[in-house]
């Protein structure tokens, strides 16, 4: 009996270790904000959290990113790196909140080391100017005894190629086409044999297709306006000209052939209240003209676990 118990207990222990290791090599993506500059309560500004091993990486840091993190019980100080796709305001306005609130000592903050951030040229300048803007606040906090180390910033301007390798997590930046916002980047994150790609803001782009090949999940932006609005509104035409339409995104998905395609940073253009607002259902229907594979319309706080199986939860 003792031998059987010993064998059985060891077997169960090994099984638990194996299961833990499998789960431990999953990628977990949480869409924190899936919206645009429009201040919608249901779609916060662009931001996504990627959890891979001990790393908690943010792709962009738009409006309300910290609120969504705390809704998922992730301390702001636990974020180990931020990667900016480009420097349009809707992708960066959450940075001061994440940086400084994450430095505070209560459980929602508690960052002990430097705030680490990567992005296109201008990122170092952005952070240097934020340090100037919040110098008084930082001085007050330090006078209250909060260690200065948590307010330090390590900012890097990057170019295309591998930009981060730590704890088995590899982040690769690649250039995309966001018209006048140059350079703009997408990111591919690889971990434990699995991968996720974030398009960033882009028009239909061959470089994105190249770097997305073999990815498990492709998270892509999309923009759409009703044709009758486009005929009338130059502002709507300009916005659409910066982004990828549903039919174009479907073409990208078809050529990349990911295990799952997901929309985030959903830009539904409404420059004139006289026209009916476009909907997410419109976007999905149009995408099906050029893509018939697995597809999800991203929502704030949606989670995607990427392992041997892909599990999506709202």
Where in the sequence are the language-model features?
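N-terminal secretory signal peptides that target proteins for export/translocation
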Residues: 1-7
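Binuclear metal-dependent hydrolase catalytic cores
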Residues: 2, 22-196, 282-311
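Bacterial N-terminal signal peptides
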Residues: 8-21
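Residue-level micro-sites within transmembrane alpha helices that shape
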Residues: 9, 89-90, 220
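Cap/insert and terminal regions of metallo-dependent hydrolase folds
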Residues: 185-186, 195, 203-302
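Short, solvent-exposed mixed-charge patches
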Residues: 218, 313-314
